[in-house]
């Protein structure tokens, strides 16, 4: 009886794992270029500047803002790590790899442990913003931009720019951090 149960369990678990990992592959026939940091239109860059409340001419780190323009609107996907779907820590990992040529660990809490904490008067563009959302550990991370704005991956709206002065972010804000 136990042997029969183990065989049935193995078959059920095996088919469940196969079903969870199957992907349908479709190709775009629209002729559009895939979203990348290198083919960002100037109108998207202007939109990012507008969201930050700055003029395009005030954008100095062009690689950073090209990355933001390309990834803006990417859907949230827990465990996702590419432009088709990402979570907050992987957005930050990709941004740091592509813009700053730095490697980061996979979780927001591990990232925070690699940083020196900063006061709001010391924070600069590219520093990380950490949140403890109903937890004792850091559970959310974003990257500081300008004018109290930061980029992050929202579970509901995907990759977006938010304001640190919004009540939700004020409530859960933990600290700013700069890589040691």
Kindly give the residue locations of the regions a language model identified.
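Post-signal-peptide N-terminal segment of Sec-exported extracytoplasmic proteins
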Residues: 37-84
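Bacterial N-terminal signal peptides that target proteins for export
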Residues: 1-8
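Glycine- and charge-enriched low-complexity intrinsically disordered segments
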Residues: 167-180
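C-terminal motif of bacterial Sec signal peptides marking the signal peptidase cleavage site
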Residues: 16-19
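Bacterial signal peptide processing site
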Residues: 21-24
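Catalytic cysteine-centered active-site loop
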Residues: 51-55, 74-125
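...with weaker cross-activation on analogous glycine-rich loops/strands in unrelated enzymes
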Residues: 56, 102-166
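Solvent-exposed, polar/charged alpha-helical surfaces in well-ordered, non-transmembrane soluble domains
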Residues: 62, 66-70, 90-94, 124, ...
């Amino acid at each position: 009886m136990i042997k029969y149960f183990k065989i049935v369990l193995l078959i059920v678990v095996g088919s469940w794992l196969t079903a969870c990992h199957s992907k349908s592959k479709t190709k775009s026939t629209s002729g559009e270029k895939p979203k990348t940091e290198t083919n960002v239109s100037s109108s998207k860059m202007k939109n990012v500047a507008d969201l930050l409340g700055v003029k395009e001419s005030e954008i100095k780190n062009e690689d950073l803002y090209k990355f933001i323009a390309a990834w803006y609107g990417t859907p949230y996907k827990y465990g996702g790590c590419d432009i088709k779907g990402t979570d907050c820590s992987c957005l930050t990992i990709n941004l740091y790899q592509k813009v700053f040529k730095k490697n980061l660990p996979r979780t927001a809490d591990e990232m925070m442990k690699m940083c020196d904490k900063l006061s709001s008067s010391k924070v600069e563009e590219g520093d990380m913003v950490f949140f403890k959302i109903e937890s004792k550990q850091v559970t959310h991370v974003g990257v500081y931009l300008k004018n109290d704005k930061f980029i992050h991956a929202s579970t509901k709206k995907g990759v977006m720019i938010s304001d640190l002065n919004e009540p939700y972010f004020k409530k859960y804000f933990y600290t700013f951090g700069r890589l040691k």
